[in-house]
Amino acid sequence: MDFLCYDRGMTEDHGAVRADPLTRIIDAALQRAGGWLPFDRFMALALYAPGLGYYANASRKFGRMPESGSDFVTAPELTPLFGRALARQVAEALEHTGTDELWEFGAGSGALAAQLLEALGDRVARYRIVDLSGTLRERQQHALAAHAGKVEWLSELPERMRGVIVGNEVLDAMPVQLVTRSGGQWFERGVVRLAGGALGWEDRPTGLRPPVEIEGGHDYLTEIHPQARAFIATLAERLEQGAAFFIDYGFPEAEYYHPQRHMGTVMCHRGHLADADPLADVGQKDITAHVDFTGIALAGQDAGLAVLGYTSQARFLLNAGLLPMLEAASLPERTLAARLIHEHEMGELFKVIGFAAGEGWDALGFAEGDRSHTL
């Protein structure tokens, strides 16, 4: 069987094998797998290996500027107006579902939790954070000290859930499989140790395919997202009463797998700079892939959830009342918040999808500009 094996055209300082603990864990996984590790398993180790992966180690992730030692900024760190606008949709969802619990997956620095708790007040009896990172949990506990009586942390999904769920930039950090078409044949891309000791790629023939046919015969690299779909399906099975809202960057299926998007969407973030090499500086930078929102919607529907809507972050926040908040804000606050809705910043690239357990309703955030028909 033919394999396609090659290096990454990297500079020589990436070539040596580092004898650090994360490298040893990856090498042990490679050995157990026969020398070839599917990318989703590599990505899981790089991001979540206990105490060593990017989201499990002590490095600072979130912040507005690289001078802070951070790697990227998310909307809640940019401005509290994000959380205040989202809170209006959450309040409506709590009322419609008859619940008083709020759940957040991957709470990051705790900024969004603090904003929601402040805005919602007594409408939330309990705020539960599900996060794999012990280091981030410590930071969240510090940020949420004023709300300590309401907040609870969990490291895994409970068997049963009631309430409203929010997840901001959670789905993009779930491991993906890489598939590539070369010479008309499909391969799965995995990670190997090259002869010189560096990490490299090796493509192996596979039965895996993107969810849609990719037109043309040109070489093509993309991702498939079984873990994100499985997460939504499990969430749907366990959400007995409530709703869920996920905010992330991504596209509907037709855009995601467009013939011209032939280089995939995997990106890395460090020091507020982006690169496309997940095999360099492993554990020291974020690895992400855009979200296939059609796959997310179908996973929820197949498991019994109703899709409340799907739209851009800009339209969602404006529907939720961001404009009056901007008018009442200071000039510096308005400048920062403009990034949330500007089409060349977060406004168009980021999307919002909403689900309800049971019967849906005309949700505030999707009142205008709902794009569910594009999924």
Walk through the language-model features, giving the residues of each:
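Rossmann-like AdoMet
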Residues: 2-105, 109-156, 161, 179, ...
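Generic recognition of stable, solvent-exposed alpha-helical segments in well-folded globular domains
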Residues: 21, 38-41, 77, 81, ...
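A residue-level signal for conserved active-site and pocket-lining positions in enzyme catalytic cores
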Residues: 46, 165, 296
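Active-site flanking residues adjacent to catalytic metal/cofactor-binding acidic residues
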Residues: 103, 130, 165-168, 247
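Catalytic P-loop NTPase motifs of RecA-like helicase/translocase cores
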Residues: 136, 173-174, 253
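A short SAM/SAH-binding and catalytic strip from SAM-dependent methyltransferases
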Residues: 160-180, 225-226, 238, 244
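A mobile, often basic/glycine-rich helix-loop segment
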Residues: 166-212, 259-269
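Long, Lys/Arg- and hydrophobic-enriched amphipathic alpha-helices
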Residues: 210-375
